Amino acid sequence: MVHGIDATQEFYGALFGWEFVPGPQQLGPYVRALLDGKEVAGIGQLPPDRHLPVAWTTYLATNDADETAETIRCCGGTVAVGPIDAAEAGRMAICSDPTGAVFGIWQAELHHGIAAAGPPGTPVWNELLTYEASAVGKFYRTVFGYEAEPVVSPDVDFLTLHVDGRPVASLHGVGTELPRDRGPHWMTYFEVADTDAAARLVTELGGRVLRPPWEGTAGRRTEGRLALVADPEGAVFTIVRSAGG
């Protein structure tokens, strides 16, 4: 959700090569982002009187949004919006886990989510940065039925979440290293062809580079070159050129 949807489209269109088409309008103006005709993201506009921080929202799939919303409440989380129908696309809600990290839930009908992942300009991973991965991991396992694979190390607090044996997201406990102005939050990783060039383009388009390019891993699953950036409205995300990509 953003404040200026037109300017945001210009930024991401220039950065990732996205095109945009109208989407469901239940929560106000909303567009779907397409890359080569395949949906890769969605951008909605906040009401003019809602002066809220702008961020990318990670959506987690469910077969029953209403039942999942109730389970979230019972497990100490919060349901801030919904569940509501998004036209014929599906049913959704905006929620937060017990530590305050915001995420969405999505019950698919006609729209089953991202149609492309891997090529430059597409989201390739989602990671929760939190105080303690093992503690909040119980919440996500209970609510969504994920299998959790921990990293066996006394120095690393990290869980990979799986569905039917397939890795789908990760939880990274960083303790007091969490930014004080953000708290626990989900991070979206977008693939790029050249991390350094993309980081320069971010600044040329009015965004900011919060951490210059470095060699590392995206969610400890794929090595590559990454940079932490923010769009002109302040939404933070990570760009990554995956090794071998």
Residue ranges and their predicted role:
Residues 24-118:
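Active-site-adjacent scaffolding segments
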Residues 1-9, 55-58, 106-138, 146-149, ...:
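N-terminal beta-strand motif that seeds the catalytic metal site of vicinal oxygen chelate
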Residues 1-39, 74, 82-90, 128-167, ...:
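Core segments of cupin and vicinal oxygen chelate
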Residues 1-3, 32-33, 48-71, 75-124, 149-166, 173-178, 205-245, ...:
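Vicinal oxygen chelate
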Residues 34, 44, 106, 127, ...:
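Residues in well-ordered beta-strands of folded domains
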Residues 39, 49, 167-168, 177:
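Active-site/binding-pocket entry motifs
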